């Protein structure tokens, strides 16, 4: 398992080294990230879902264990934030950090590299499940608790609608929904479109990991490291890398009875839950001007620790 995973992390290392040696390559970084987010990954997720059978989508244990794992980490982070005097809406960002991972950029390519094409569909579904709840919770929290407009109910409805629109407009969400439409309407994907999507999707894995390395090279640990920040960061990282996958595994196996015959689905649920903190949390921290240093440090530490924790998690689910 270690030998399977090493090349994946070497691609991240190559991206990191390139980013460090080319500090002025900001436009190139953006183009690579845009290619991954708007073209390669959506193509991969679309074809994975579009070629599925409706029976493949009825993985209720997989979906519920994933969502419960997210919810538990989110709520524990909220309790931690409250304990140190951080309330809503600010605590929603810390909760997002404890439950939102790099499922697209890192989780998808790792799963497909280790388990093959059979992991593409569960990885696509998991990506959406991990994106929607945390993003919506942050947007709603900041809209409702940080404004003083008249009419709380109207404000809440507007906020929920806006957050739903934001998540639906995500290219990865659009790709999965488009693929789902083909399945539900029983439409055969034309050969040309399938070949085109596969050709683009084949580049998603290495390009996404390279882009992840580039992003890591742009984050500066020393600027964010201090004792106060570390007291918040470390529990968040533990929640993300340890508690969330542990809860997901426990619910999947002991509540929903997922076992060997659902091996890839079980592995996907746990591996996706074990992903390091996603860069999207930093985007929201910058947007709302709340402790981007805490989030940046959390992302860096979780990524570094993931070099050890993800291979450990994968070793529990060896490919058949």
Stretch-by-stretch model annotation:
Residues 1-320:
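Alpha-helical transmembrane segments of multi-pass small-molecule/ion transporters
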């Amino acid at each position: 398992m270690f030998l399977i995973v090493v090349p994946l992390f070497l691609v991240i290392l190559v991206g990191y080294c390139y980013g460090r040696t080319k500090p002025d390559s900001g436009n190139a970084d953006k183009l690579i990230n845009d290619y991954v987010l708007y073209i390669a990954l959506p193509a991969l997720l679309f074809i994975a879902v579009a070629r599925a059978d409706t029976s493949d989508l009825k993985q209720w244990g997989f979906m519920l264990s994933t969502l419960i794992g997210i919810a538990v980490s989110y709520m524990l982070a909220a309790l931690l934030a409250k304990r140190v005097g951080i309330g809503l809406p600010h605590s929603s960002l810390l909760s997002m950090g404890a439950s939102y991972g790099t499922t697209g950029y890192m989780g998808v390519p790792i799963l497909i590299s280790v388990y093959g094409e059979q992991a593409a569909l569960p990885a696509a579904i998991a990506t959406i499940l991990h994106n929607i709840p945390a993003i919506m919770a942050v947007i709603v929290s900041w809209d409702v608790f940080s404004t003083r407009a008249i009419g709380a109910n109207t404000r809440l409805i507007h906020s929920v609608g806006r957050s739903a629109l934001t998540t639906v407009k995500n290219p990865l969400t659009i790709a999965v929904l488009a693929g789902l439409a083909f399945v539900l309407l029983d439409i055969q994907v034309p050969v040309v479109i399938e070949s085109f999507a596969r050709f683009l999707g084949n580049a998603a894995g290495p390009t996404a990991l390279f882009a992840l390395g580039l992003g890591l090279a742009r984050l500066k640990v020393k600027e964010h490291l201090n004792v106060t920040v570390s007291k918040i960061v470390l529990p968040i990282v533990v929640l993300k890398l340890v508690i969330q996958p542990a809860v997901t595994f426990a619910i999947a196996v002991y509540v929903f009875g997922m076992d060997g015959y659902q091996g890839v689905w079980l592995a996907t649920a746990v591996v996706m839950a074990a992903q390091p903190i996603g860069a999207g949390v930093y985007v929201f921290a910058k947007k709302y001007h709340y402790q981007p240093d805490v989030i940046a440090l959390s992302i860096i530490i979780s990524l570094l620790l993931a070099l050890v924790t993800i291979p450990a998690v994968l070793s529990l689910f060896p490919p058949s």
